[in-house]
Amino acid sequence: MFTLSLLSRGHGKLVQNKQKLEVYFEPEDYLNWKSPEDYILVRKPQDEGNADQHTWSLFLPKTFSTRKGALILYSEGLAISAWTPEERRKGPYRPKGRRKRPDLELHTLQDLKEAILAYGRRQREQDRAWQPYLHFRSQPESQGLRQIQPGYSAKRYLRGLLRTWPPGTINKLQCAGYIKDSVLLQDSQLNVPKNLRPQQDLSGVPLKYHLLPVFPPFWIQQGKSFGQGQQDLDEGEAGAGGQVDQGSVVKDRGIQGTCLPPLKKQPWQKDETQTEDTSKDNHHCIHTSKENHQEKAQQTSRRTLGHALFDHSWLLHDKSHTTFYYGGTFPNRKADLSDKQGTMKLHQGRSSHLFKEPPAERCLFPPVASAAGSEKNMPGDMKKKKAPKALKLPLISEEPPRVLDPLRSQLKASEPPAELFIFPVEIHYHSQHPPKGKAQRRGAPQPESAPETEEYTSSWRPPLKQVSLRGSRALRVHLPMDTDRDTLSPQEDVAPPQKGTSSPSLRKGKKSPESQRGPDSPRTSGRSSPTGPPCERPAGGALPAAGQAYESVSSNAGHGEEESSIQHLLKVNTESRTDLHMNLNETSPLTQKPENQGAQQSLEAAAQKTGEPQSCINKGLICSNRKEFYTRKLHLDMTPFLKASREEMDDHEEGGELRENHPDAQDPVRRNMTLDPLCASLAKHMQTPEADTVQKASKDYNVHHRHRGLSGHGPDSPEGLDPIDTSFLPRGKEGKTEPRLFNQKTSNNISNEMELIEKAKSRKRAKTDKSKAPKREKEGKLHEEAEAAVGKSKESKAEKKSQLISKGKKTGAKGKRTRKEGNLETAAELSGPDGINSKETKDRSGGGFFRSGSGVEDPWVSSKVEAPESQVSIDGRSSPTQTAAVPGNMEPEEDRSHEDPSKAFLVKREQEKASRDRLRAERAEMRRLEVERKRREQEEQRRLQQEQLERAERMKEELELEQQRRVEEIRLRKQRLEEERQWQEEEERRQWLQLQMAQERARQQQEEFRRKCQELQRKKQQEEAERAEAEKQRLKELEMQLAEEQKHLMEMAEEERLEYQRRKQEAEEKTRWEAEDRRQKEKEAARLAQEEAMKQAQDQARQKDALKKHLHFHQELHKEASGLQWTHNISRPWVYSYFHFLQIPRP
């Protein structure tokens, strides 16, 4: 309501001094009548089915009539509550406890604003200019279904409240156990004064949550499905004390992403007891039955599937790469480990920072035990037969498992991890199963069956068309793994290694024949077993895969069954058939030349039979400068441990020349395709007892090496065609159960293959040295990055074969090189420019791979149908960049050996030329687009500069005009002041002259008056003199007359003298009476004149009084008339009837 005036409060004001009470109006009184309508809340549904919306209708206000109009005293509309009229008619009595709430509920600040300002909502547009109310800028109908954006989470506000508390209170509450959430205390900063603590404005719009710059792009761009399970990154901070349910995680995260089947809920206590019971037999369970391994793999896969989540949009992303946190923890998960049971609890954490010191309970991967402690847990044979040249990355210091310290975490949460070692790469590596004791030590449940694993494997392959669209380049690095560090202490969830595990040598430069695989070849990644150091030991020298690193964050990778789940994950991922390698030709020689290639060749033959996987790191598509940065970073971090690897640079540079010019390397789309038709149908081979051969080979060299392709397998060797499914077998236990028969068959095939490869390589080396060397220097980075996904695995496999066989057979290495070259040519033919087409990819997977018609062709063909579904690893950890092309290697070796080398060379040249032309066209188009963009930018810059110049010129002109105007104003002001001064001087001079003239005139008047006075005095004196002379003459005459009369009297007689005396007295008497009469007349005349003067004076006074009265009357009359006119002018708006103002306005 308006502010009440004196009149409405019952007060008046005395006006003038007549003791008359006059009404004194205030401005508030004149504003009341300006409100033509008022509003009350009336229930009126805007749409059917929604009766909670209201409108505001007209209500006549209460008024007070005065002699000059109507005054609005108050309005009932402002005093009515938000109850609807129907509710108010139900009765005044309602119990306090069961009082019905009003229909109009205020949920947001906008609703409150509507309730406060609703009486001004429906005003007419033309009336809003003079109404003194606030109005809505938009109609309420458009805001009925408005989405409300939530603010910060409750934890954020609680932390903001905790900042205002004194540190002593927070400490008391924490010590008393009332505050158990360490995340709430994380930002409280108890040891920092209040004035120095960072303050957050919780009243504004919440900012976007900050992510680390090392996150891969698909986490941020495609983070919708990833963040679906988290629901709120900030609310996840409160989850440090709770345990996430596996089924709920799958349910929450399966909204947008492709979610794996949920698991059966199994209590962690059962897993922990199994861990304690079975860990005692860890060193004695080396030779375990085949069924136990299969059941363990199945159980591990089922537990992994319960937490795995991936989205097809991630697989199709063309710039995605995975960042691996070496020695640190993943930002989106926090794992807490209890003191004695080792239970891993998965929590959703903030993505804005990492923990400073990642202890064993927080690390996604357990830290590495010391070398001495690991050797104690190793068998005696493993100590004696370790790889001679294995890369040893720095160890992570052991930390006993401990309970999470909230104070320490909150003080150190803002600092980065001390041992953060970032590899933005994509990783393929071993899939070895740990012993039974190891899996149970981590809380892994007992295995079930292998057929279910095959179903999961085949059901989680995305469609081939989707995968074929992925166009990311890959960069690989060979990182050797040290067997003496594969073993991890029980506190760190690491079990001792088994026999048959050894570290692969680090390779650089030379690509294996598998690296030349076409776009249809599968290249997925998984996580290695506990004996495979990339998973359990981030500091041990191996890195997790890109997709795996991501899924380890979005799945239950932090749980205790980590190692056992890794084994099953790589059951599908073993199609990569590549060792952990990265193409670092341009940065540093990271290769290591093995001392004995014969041992490697024999080991390669064994690896081909067992189908052991090799880890590989695939770096996603990155620009050349970014690739150089990460490559140099990797080189700098690993140089102290790779001094001996520089000798192998020359040996592997030869294969690099062929790789630089490979046609598939020119096609960025085909390079990134993934086809996995081999995994699902070949999972059954894991049940074959083939571990004895692997065990024998592991004593010669590292069992972690995996065969480079199918080139070394004969058509009648099922294991030659099934290198990926043997990854289901645990490497430690497979070592002694593998048959030796396949090793002999594979060695013969390898020797024949390497001879053919060596011949073709010699021919191509001579040609590529002449023609391709200059171009390789210019396009080295591009080719290196492009061929990392296509040609590296083939050459690395063939190179490893040659190294393994050269230990016993020097000629075998030469044959393997020849056969490797043939594989390279065959892969080039099969992976042509048209390899992007998904149909051709399926055709090649069906027919192009198996032209020999061997006995193993049926399983391969049958698995082709399931390829689109089983294209990624079971746990969903395969990154979009984990792609490779392998159609060439899948072709039987006999067909490749019988092909015409010249024809293959011509086909390869044509494909290389087409690829170069296509690449050149793409570069030209990119250059054109870049030039166009730069031209547009230059035009825009010129336009902006022109506008800026024009704006500056206009501002300059306006400034000049303003200055001129000011100068003119100053000049006019000075002129006006000068004129005023002159006028004042003239006025003063004129006044002075007038004063002088007046003084002169007064002086003259005084002189004239004095002169007249003197003349009158002189005349008066003269008259007095004449009168005195006349009187003196008269007296003299009278004396003479008296003397003559006396003389005459003496001469006269007595009688005559008496007569004379009598006449003389009569004459004197007559003169005296005449004088008296004249005096009486003069006196009477003076009296009459005085009376007449008095009468005239009275008449004049009477006339003057009458004139004064008349003037006063006229003055009073004029004053009254003017005052009346002023009064009438003020009160003119009030002459109408107040009903005129209370009429209902027209709609």
Swiss-Prot record:
The keyword Cell cycle does not apply. This is Uncharacterized protein KIAA2012 homolog. Residues 268-296, 768-802, 895-945 have a biased composition (Basic and acidic residues). It comes from the Eukaryota. It comes from Bos taurus. Signal peptide: none annotated. Keywords: Coiled coil. Residues 584-603, 743-752, 870-884 have a biased composition (Polar residues). InterPro entries: DUF4670 (IPR031440). Residues 743-804, 907-1112 form a coiled coil. Residues 226-245, 255-297, 431-617, 647-670, 705-945, 1003-1032, 1060-1090 are annotated as: Disordered. The keyword Ligase does not apply. Residues 431-441, 807-819 have a biased composition (Basic residues). Residues 538-549 have a biased composition (Low complexity).
